[in-house]
Amino acid sequence: MLEKILRSESGNVHYWISNTIRKESLSLFFLHGLTASHDLFVNQIGYFEKDYNVIVWDAPAHGMSRPYRGFSYEKVANDVIKILKENKIDSAVLIGQSMGGYIAQSVIKRFPEYVKAFVSIDSTPFGEKYYSKIDRWILKHIEGMSKLYPDKSLRKAIAKQNTNSKHAYENMYNMLSVYDKDELCHLMAIGYAGFMEDNCNLQINCPTLLLVGEKDNTGKVRQYNKAWSNEINVPITWIRDAAHNSNDDQPEQVNRCIKEFLLGIAE
């Protein structure tokens, strides 16, 4: 994988891409969740890069892509497209975990022609009807609520909430370690509040795969996905013994499900 940097007035965005882009192969863009980094997909990169063009990044305001001024999902969606154009990729399968699914839907909202397919991993849908007033209030006030936790307790709570295995817990905890408490709390605020601002009723016309950990107890993720599944007539694929970071908890299951999906859309 080659490390590259997308440079902009808002900040530098670090990403990693296959050494050679093969025009005949599908391109996969892996989009990690809030407060994580490209390390979330450590168990996907090696599995997929032999057959596909693979891109992973540290999303704007995350990991190595800091500082980043004026985070918004519109900006981030544009950054995704700039990376594709920079590497002469006409379209990609967007694979988004949690916040990464919001980014994918933000791209679909603005640039549907660049999205070959969408894989949602423990994410939730765009759409006004899914979120109650209390849901929106909580998401808009997450910064203040998270500041009530002592620093170390906050990191442990986030890592524990998101995972159901020792290796995934340790990976999540390490990804959180690059932020001080104020930055971590603010990042959660802009991630969730930004989603509420960008949220809209969205029709997704590309092939879609919904993956959800059976033990995902983050917010109402399972409830939202059941409603989403019914709305778009796409069944949920439940990942056994996995929490919110299901691709890290159970990489073999998730990789197999994604591979079967990719083979289906390539036919």
Protein language model annotation of sequence segments:
Residues 1-29, 51-52, 89-90, 159, ...:
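Alpha/beta-hydrolase fold catalytic core
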Residues 11-66:
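Conserved HGGG/HGGXW glycine-rich cap/lid loop of the alpha/beta-hydrolase fold
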Residues 46, 55-95, 256:
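Active-site loop/oxyanion-hole signature of alpha/beta-hydrolase fold enzymes
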Residues 96, 100, 104:
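Gly/Ala-rich beta-loop-alpha elbow adjacent to hydrolase catalytic centers
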Residues 105, 109, 116-146:
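Flexible "cap/lid" loop of the alpha/beta hydrolase fold
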Residues 129-131, 147-203:
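Conserved alpha/beta-hydrolase catalytic His-Asp/Glu region
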Residues 208-242, 248:
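Conserved loop-alpha-helix segment in the C-terminal half of the alpha/beta-hydrolase fold
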Residues 233-267:
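Catalytic active-site module of serine/aspartate enzymes centered on a nucleophile-bearing elbow/loop
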